[in-house]
From Swiss-Prot:
SMART domains: Ala_racemase_C (SM01005). This is Alanine racemase. The modification N6-(pyridoxal phosphate)lysine is found at residue 35. It catalyses: L-alanine = D-alanine. The active site is at residues 35, 254.
């Protein structure tokens, strides 16, 4: 019989969160970003849940796009990193994938065979991928000369600081983008990551790209998902496998990093960093059992962690402990571990089964 440690995926929560994104997008359409195996939730099941809600998905690479096709969905699929080799363009054309082209090498691959419809990435200040605004006239002229401009769908950029409500950079990037693409009003525009949906008066143009918000985690500094009207889609659970009383003066776990100041009832939970639970989540990190919040004690081990059961004396072996979900948000755990909810959700390992409900 398998270990009961599990990630439960609430498909209704996914749908709720997408509808929230669509509501915030206003007149823009919303493409569902399902990269990184649907942010750890299972790309095929996420695509199944959201297919009736959207006409476009977005992924990082062609393997993820192929997984969506393998699930039977014929939606347009945007490849946010474009293609990594020339031969992939023919597959994009055959399968209806839309690569985001961001460099001269990718442009040079066009026209060598079957060319797909594509987006063009504009670097407005994040300086990861994309053409600088002053390079766009030459890019577009080259496409016109090669007879490929008709395959261009639109322009894309990505915000560096949209999660920070006090930052002025998003407004600056928006203005740079608008000026850069103004000569081609017939092409569509896409700028809005999850955080951009929550910025008042932020233009989202024709297509927004909600990602982390679809899974119920917060994209905004200082705001919880619940405060933003989102529902957690993943509940990570593991069983209590033993309980004991640690006597005053005794310590728990590797490094003896926590010592009891008084007799304390504790339990061991069958989950650890080999399952994707963050090793740096130390004493005080919240969890929950029987609907009540508890706290971690000491260091997280590879396959186990310890919790303080003082607040829930009725807790017993076999009870399921929520590591994150509806009682304890993934963002709370991430803060305690010095990271972000994105990393935790995408980091749940393959030995934790996903149960879609």
């Amino acid at each position: 019989m398998p270990r009961p440690t599990v990630a439960r995926i609430d498909l209704d929560a996914l749908k709720h969160n997408f509808r929230r994104a669509r509501e915030l997008a206003g007149t823009a359409y919303a493409m569902a970003v399902v990269k990184a195996d649907g942010y750890g939730h299972g790309i095929r099941s996420v695509a199944d849940a959201l297919a009736p809600e959207t006409s476009r998905f977005a992924v990082a690479c062609i393997e993820e796009a192929i997984a969506i096709r393998g699930a039977g969905h014929r939606h347009s699929v945007v490849l946010l990193q474009g293609t990594h080799q020339k031969d992939d363009l023919a597959e994009c054309e055959r399968s209806g994938f839309e690569p985001v082209l961001h460099c001269q090498q990718q442009l040079s691959w066009l026209g060598a065979g079957r060319s797909p419809r594509f987006w063009i990435k504009v670097n407005t200040g994040m300086n990861r991928l994309g053409f600088r605004p002053e390079e766009l006239p030459e890019v577009m002229a080259g496409l016109e000369e090669a007879g490929l401009k008709h395959l261009a769908i639109g322009f894309v950029t990505h915000f560096a600081c949209a999660d920070d409500s006090d930052s002025e950079m998003t407004g600056l990037q928006t203005r740079i983008f608008e000026r850069a693409v103004a000569p081609w009003p017939d092409l569509m525009r896409s700028v809005g990551n999850s955080a951009a949906h929550f910025r008042p008066n932020q233009p989202l143009y024709e297509w927004s790209r909600p990602g982390i918000m679809l899974y119920g985690a917060s994209p905004m500094e200082g705001k919880t998902g619940a405060e933003l009207g989102l529902c957690p889609a993943m509940t990570l659970q593991a069983p209590l496998i033993t309980t004991r009383v640690v006597r005053a003066g005794e310590s728990v776990g590797y490094g003896a990093s926590w010592t009891a100041s008084q007799d304390t009832r504790m339990g061991m939970v069958a989950i650890g960093y080999a399952d994707g639970y963050p090793r740096h989540a130390g004493t005080g990190t919240p969890a929950a059992v029987r609907g009540q919040r508890i706290r971690l004690l000491g260091r997280v081990s590879m396959d186990m962690l310890a919790v303080d059961l003082s607040a829930v004396p009725e807790a017993r072996e076999g009870d399921m402990v929520e590591l994150w979900g509806k009682t304890v948000s993934v963002d709370e755990v991430a803060t305690c571990a010095g990271t972000i909810g994105y990393e935790l959700l995408t980091g749940v390992t393959s030995r934790v089964p996903r149960v879609h409900e």
